[in-house]
């Protein structure tokens, strides 16, 4: 089940009884044991669902095209991949075939913490910088996981808001922690927040 932008799964403790009112965005309900059910809720209907054999699911799209997560990727492997990418690092961070699990919010935060301009070409990063990228990605994702994620707009897991949004340094912020004005630009059609002072472009 690729959840896409705002899809979510909610595990409901009590099974729906006759006459109960469902959310209008509950599209699929899985009836589980012990009076439990799992509801698939998707406000904008971006998500997808496909029934596959358990032994073959990793060979199905889009899973078969996903790269490793930051927690498991070897930085030298990532370095070799980035050497072939003459694209902005912000765009490459969102390419799930290279490294999976980094969305737009976290890509912005990773670039800021590294003092890395989002327009920087991925293929100019040194091995040390790529190692730093992996370390920073893991650090930020771990913090977000511990805080229950980042609740922006309509998404919350299990009906509970995450708390990492209060720790965001640049994404949807007006000023960075040092007080500099944040600039918002579009890179490959994705909203990109960065600090032109802290993340100066290399010349």
Task: Describe the residue ranges of each PLM region.
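Short histidine-centered catalytic/ligand-binding loop motif
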Residues: 19, 62-71, 120-127
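Short, surface-exposed beta-strand-loop junctions and turns on beta-sheet-rich folds
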Residues: 13, 45-47, 201
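Single conserved hydrophobic/aromatic residue that forms the stacking wall/gate
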Residues: 1-7, 12
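Basic, nucleic-acid-binding surfaces and adjacent catalytic neighborhoods in DNA/RNA-processing proteins
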Residues: 80-203
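A residue-level signal for conserved active-site and pocket-lining positions in enzyme catalytic cores
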Residues: 12, 30, 41, 103, ...
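Structured, non-catalytic alpha/beta "coupling" segments that mediate domain-domain communication
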Residues: 29-52, 147-151
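A short, charged helix-loop
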Residues: 46-87
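A gly/proline- and charged-residue-enriched helix-loop-helix capping module
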Residues: 18-19, 23-28, 36
């Amino acid at each position: 089940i690729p959840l896409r932008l705002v899809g979510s799964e909610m595990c409901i403790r009590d099974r729906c009884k006759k006459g109960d009112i469902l959310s209008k965005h509950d599209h699929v309900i899985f009836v589980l044991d012990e009076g439990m059910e799992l509801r698939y809720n998707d406000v904008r209907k971006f998500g997808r669902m496909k029934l596959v054999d358990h032994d073959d699911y990793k060979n199905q799209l889009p899973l078969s095209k996903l790269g490793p997560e930051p927690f498991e990727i070897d930085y030298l492997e990532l370095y070799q991949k980035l050497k072939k990418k003459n694209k902005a690092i912000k765009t490459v961070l969102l390419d799930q075939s290279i490294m999976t699990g980094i969305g737009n919010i976290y890509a912005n935060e990773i670039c800021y913490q590294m003092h890395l301009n989002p327009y920087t070409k991925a293929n100019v990063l040194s091995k040390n910088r790529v190692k730093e990228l992996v370390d920073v990605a893991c650090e930020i994702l771990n913090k977000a996981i511990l805080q229950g994620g980042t609740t922006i707009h309509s998404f919350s897991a299990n009906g509970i808001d995450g708390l990492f949004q209060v720790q965001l340094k640049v994404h949807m912020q007006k000023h960075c922690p040092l007080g500099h004005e944040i600039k918002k630009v579009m890179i490959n059609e994705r909203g990109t927040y960065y600090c032109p002072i802290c993340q100066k472009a290399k010349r």
